[in-house]
């Protein structure tokens, strides 16, 4: 509805319209004796048409806005200094990564607080080293402010350490897991994403693993069950909302006052801001 | 132009002075159209429809007093401040002055809608009457995601979720829920709060997809107003049952996605007054107690406050409260029936059933409920569970001491106000049709089969109450006596009706014989005259029928002639409506017949 109004006025308008319909119908039947013709008031028809036109224009306007934003990036002139700086940043990131892997010793995955990890890609630079880019694609964190659920294993934690400046991760609680899946979850079936508006699609995709409804999916993700891998791959990365005041998103680790890296339980506060 | 300004040679009177078009109103107020729309929504101003449209039929007209009403509101100045502030921020960013931009963003101008709530709803009952749209909107936005493109903010969605849970917790606590209905759009609820029936719609607990056909600016303005309204109403309702507002939830239960249960626990624990009550509430109570006396001394006030604080230390304070609440609750028989429907029943919810909805409904009717997961009051292996709500084709483990029913059973029991038999709702079976409690079957003229069954079950449940005279409850005794009187009266009426029918039949038979003028002896004597007599009888019957029809038609025509034209039109409209209703009922019956025939064909 374009102009939602209290139902009392709508009811009153409907009553008036109904009376008009009845009167005209009575007159027609009295005069001609034929069957009653459908009657809708002219202003109602006009309003309906205006609403439809507005919807069409709104859709076109949004599409044009998206196209304009996409075209802004093209045709920009890059100077040689930009290329040099980009290359040096890549090399520096790579060297830092190797140093980080050498110096930092990860605790075993079994000693962590939870087996479920939620990783969010934070806004960062475009100058990614190919190695990091490959790992981010493997984790499905290719877009800024997207998140995925991961199982806390040694291999996963090592990968997260490799790409630490570009992500933040932690251990979500059941409330946030449920909120994310219910509100932002998108399934992936037949090479196409779709919103989780029906349990039939979930049963069709994951029924062989005993997951037949949305709540089963939440339970499997939250408890890191035996079919976590299939359930997690079924869910597309969650698109999170940019907050009103843009986050600073510094590249320093969270414990050092920045925004990247392991937040442990503090990830819940961040998720509540973004979801 | 308003009426008070009259340049020379230009006078305005009548509709030209009373009404103003939208464009001129926007110019007069010197705000943008979007701000004008927002202000109209918040202040409750809507377009009028004058009989004489001075500037054409295609324009929107507002009453001049409404526009003056908007012009004198402080909000209009506040909106101008917000606009100026936004321009300043934009300018600071354009000049790359980040420090100034940050400082401006840290101190945005804000406004409150509290005054508008008091302005539009002077009494609490007025606010309750207008709560249907408010609750539906808040529950809708509680289920929506915060999408990037739209201007739906995350904080607003969390606020709507909190408000909706608080409202549901109050309804559940006071057992005010009366009707439920599951439809394609969502789940309808109807509650009765302080004598007002409130109906709202909650979306299903699945993902909601936002379409681009909806103008969210208008909806967000309505939502802004409704959030404030529901906050006020929750405040007053919570304090009416001696519970602090806003509630402080258990963070552990909150983290486990159990806000509604945490709220119910908070309301149970926060029931005791005393230290938890604010001082203002005590003063309000004092004011109510001393309405008769116009003066209140300070010493008396202090003494009364001390007296109020005293009972918290006595052991009988809780009993007093319980008696008070019992006396207050005894007034409403409907509430009593609702609070004890699921008493002594213990429910366990499986994972796949709509948990939030059932956590709201089952405690509202006196039941105990638990679910799977941490933070639940009891586990699945508890032997005292009477019903387990399931919706899955296979079960991992089946306990023999409980019944496994589908979720629809709960909703149908709530609408029928009795515990329905569970055979039809067992897992794997197609449940009976889910009937709407908002439809009056007698007025519609068509009663579905299952509604008839429910009526019979209700009558049986009522009759079970009759052979229990030993209960000492006065209400029960009165209802028993009334039931007995009604039953005896109906029996007498039935007997009288039967006698009258027999007498009428005899009279009709004798009249017919007298009219024919024949006796049995004459009939046996002649055979050929019988044929002639039969034909004569037939003709006579036809004449009688024709005369009857003519008499009826004459009577109707006479009554119609006596009516005025308006009354005649109204009568015709009523007849058309009745005809339409009959057609609808016939269509339903035809569908039912087709369904039955197809079912029997499948049965073969």
From Swiss-Prot, chain B:
- Entry's SMART domains? BRCT
Spans through the membrane:
none
Q: Where is the composition biased (Basic and acidic residues)?
A: 282-299, 531-557, 577-586
A Pfam family it matches: Pescadillo_N
Keywords, comma-separated and alphabetical: Nucleus, Ribosome biogenesis, rRNA processing
The segment annotated Disordered runs over 275-299, 518-557, 574-604
Answer whether the UniProt record assigns the keyword Cell cycle to this protein: no
Please report the stretch or stretches of sequence annotated as the BRCT domain: 337-427
Major site of localization recorded for this protein:
nucleus
Any one annotated GO CC term: nucleoplasm
UniProt entry tagged with the keyword Acetylation:
no
* One Gene Ontology biological process: maturation of 5.8S rRNA from tricistronic rRNA transcript (SSU-rRNA, 5.8S rRNA, LSU-rRNA)
Return the SUPFAM superfamilies for the record.
BRCT domain
Any idea where this protein resides?
Nucleus, Nucleolus; Nucleus, Nucleoplasm
Q: Name one GO molecular function term.
A: mRNA binding
The similarity annotation says: Belongs to the pescadillo family.
What is this protein's function? Answer: Required for maturation of ribosomal RNAs and formation of the large ribosomal subunit.
Q: What is this protein called?
A: Pescadillo homolog
Question: What species is given as this protein's source?
Answer: Oryza sativa subsp. japonica
């Amino acid at each position: 509805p374009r102009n939602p109004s209290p139902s009392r006025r709508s009811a009153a308008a409907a009553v008036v319209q109904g009376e008009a319909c009845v009167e005209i119908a009575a007159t027609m039947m009295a005069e001609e004796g034929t069957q009653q013709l459908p009657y809708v008031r002219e202003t109602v028809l006009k309003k309906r048409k205006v609403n439809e036109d507005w919807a069409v224009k709104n859709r076109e306007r949004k599409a044009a806005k998206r196209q304009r934003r996409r075209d802004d990036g093209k045709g920009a002139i890059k100077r040689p200094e930009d290329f040099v700086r980009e290359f040096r940043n890549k090399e520096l990131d790579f060297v830092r990564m190797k140093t980080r892997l050498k110096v930092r010793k990860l605790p075993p995955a079994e000693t962590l607080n939870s087996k479920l990890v939620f990783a969010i890609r934070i806004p960062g630079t475009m100058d990614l080293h190919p190695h990091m880019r490959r790992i981010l694609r493997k984790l499905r964190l290719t877009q800024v402010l997207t998140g995925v659920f991961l199982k806390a294993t040694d291999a996963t934690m090592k990968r997260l350490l490799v790409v630490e400046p570009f992500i933040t991760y932690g251990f979500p609680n059941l409330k946030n897991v449920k909120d994310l899946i219910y509100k932002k979850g998108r399934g992936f079936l037949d090479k196409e994403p779709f919103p989780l508006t029906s349990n039939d699609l979930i049963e069709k995709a994951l029924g062989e693993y005993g997951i037949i409804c949305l709540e089963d999916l939440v339970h499997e993700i939250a408890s890191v069950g035996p079919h976590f891998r299939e359930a997690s791959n079924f869910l597309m990365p969650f698109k999170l909302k940019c907050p009103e005041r843009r986050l600073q998103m510094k590249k320093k680790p969270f414990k050092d006052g920045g925004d990247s890296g392991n937040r442990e339980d503090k990830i819940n506060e961040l998720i509540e801001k973004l979801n | 132009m308003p009426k008070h300004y009259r340049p020379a040679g230009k006078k305005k009177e009548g509709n030209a002075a009373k009404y103003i078009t939208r464009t001129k109103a926007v110019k007069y107020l010197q705000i943008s159209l979007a701000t004008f729309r927002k202000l109209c929504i918040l202040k409750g101003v809507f377009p009028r429809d004058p009989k004489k449209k001075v500037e054409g039929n295609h324009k929107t007209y507002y009453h001049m007093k409404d526009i003056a009403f908007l012009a004198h509101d402080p909000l209009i100045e506040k909106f101008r401040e917000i606009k100026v502030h936004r321009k300043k921020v934009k300018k600071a960013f354009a000049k790359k002055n980040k420090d100034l931009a940050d400082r401006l963003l840290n101190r945005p101008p804000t406004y409150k809608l509290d005054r508008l709530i008091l302005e539009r709803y002077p009494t609490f009952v007025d606010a309750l009457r207008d709560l249907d749209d408010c609750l539906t909107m808040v529950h809708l936005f509680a289920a929506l995601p915060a999408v990037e493109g739209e201007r739906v903010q995350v904080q607003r969605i969390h606020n709507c979720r909190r408000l909706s849970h608080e409202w549901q917790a109050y309804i559940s606590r006071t057992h005010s829920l009366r009707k439920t209905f599951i439809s394609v759009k969502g789940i309808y609820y109807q509650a009765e709060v302080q004598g007002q029936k409130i109906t709202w719609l909650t979306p299903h607990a699945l993902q909601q997809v936002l379409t681009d056909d909806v103008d969210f600016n208008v909806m967000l303005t309505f939502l802004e107003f409704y959030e404030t309204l529901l906050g006020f109403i929750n405040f007053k309702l919570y304090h009416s049952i001696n519970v602090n507002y806003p509630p402080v939830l258990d963070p552990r239960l909150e983290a486990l996605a159990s806000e509604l249960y945490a709220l119910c626990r908070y309301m149970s624990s926060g029931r005791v007054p005393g230290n938890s009550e604010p001082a203002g509430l005590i003063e309000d109570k004092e004011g109510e107690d001393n309405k008769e006396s116009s003066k209140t001394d300070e010493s008396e006030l202090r003494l009364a406050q001390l007296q109020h604080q005293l009972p918290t230390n006595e052991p009988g304070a809780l009993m007093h409260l319980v008696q008070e609440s019992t006396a207050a609750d005894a007034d409403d028989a409907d509430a009593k029936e609702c609070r004890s429907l699921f008493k002594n029943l213990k429910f366990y919810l499986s994972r796949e059933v709509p948990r939030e909805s059932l956590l709201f409904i089952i405690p509202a009717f006196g039941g105990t409920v638990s679910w799977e997961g941490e933070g639940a009051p009891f586990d699945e292996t508890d032997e005292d569970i009477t019903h387990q709500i399931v919706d899955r084709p296979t079960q991992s483990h089946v306990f023999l001491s409980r019944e496994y029913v589908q979720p629809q059973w709960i909703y149908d029991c709530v609408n029928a106000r009795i515990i329905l038999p569970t055979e039809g709702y067992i897992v794997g079976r197609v449940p009976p049709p889910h009937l709407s409690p908002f439809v009056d079957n007698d007025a519609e003229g068509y009663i579905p089969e299952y509604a008839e069954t429910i009526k019979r079950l209700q009558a049986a449940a009522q009759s079970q109450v009759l052979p229990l005279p030993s209960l000492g409850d006065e209400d029960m005794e009165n209802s028993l006596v009334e039931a007995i009187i009604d039953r005896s009266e109906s029996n007498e009426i039935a007997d009288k009706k039967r006698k009258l029918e027999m007498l009428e039949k005899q009279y009709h038979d004798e009249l017919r014989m007298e009219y024919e003028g024949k006796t049995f002896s004459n009939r046996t004597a002649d055979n050929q005259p019988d044929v002639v007599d039969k034909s004569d009888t037939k003709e006579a019957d036809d004449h009688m029928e024709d005369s009857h029809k003519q008499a009826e038609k004459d009577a109707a025509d006479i009554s119609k002639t006596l009516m005025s034209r308006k009354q005649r039109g109204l009568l015709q409209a009523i007849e058309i409506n009745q005809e339409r209703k009959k057609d609808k009922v016939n269509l339903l019956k035809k569908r039912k017949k087709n369904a039955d025939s197809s079912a029997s064909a499948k049965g073969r």
